Amino acid sequence: MSSLYFAILCLFMIFLVPLHEFGNAQGSEAELQLDPSMCLRVECAKHRNQKWCFCCAGLPRTCFLDKRGCTSVCKRESPSMA
């Protein structure tokens, strides 16, 4: 009977691992979400090979090809803090 309890415990632990990873994935995705008040998605005039750029809301000439670059700079140079 003890081997049955051990097997059930092992199965229970195996099913807990994906739930733990799912919770961590939500936290990491929340950091990547674009704050609409911080960065704006606009058509690129500077980069002809890329259709969309991401520009800081308060600094229209500060544009990036990816969301991550925009959010990292726009967080530091927030127009409300200037």
Curated annotation (Swiss-Prot):
Signal peptide: 1-22
Disulfide-bonded cysteines: 39-55, 44-74, 53-70, 56-63
A single BP term in Gene Ontology: pollen-stigma interaction
Assigned protein family: Belongs to the MEG family.
Protein name per the record: EMBRYO SURROUNDING FACTOR 1-like protein 10
Alphabetic keyword roster: Disulfide bond, Signal
Tissue specificity: Expressed in stems, leaves and flowers.
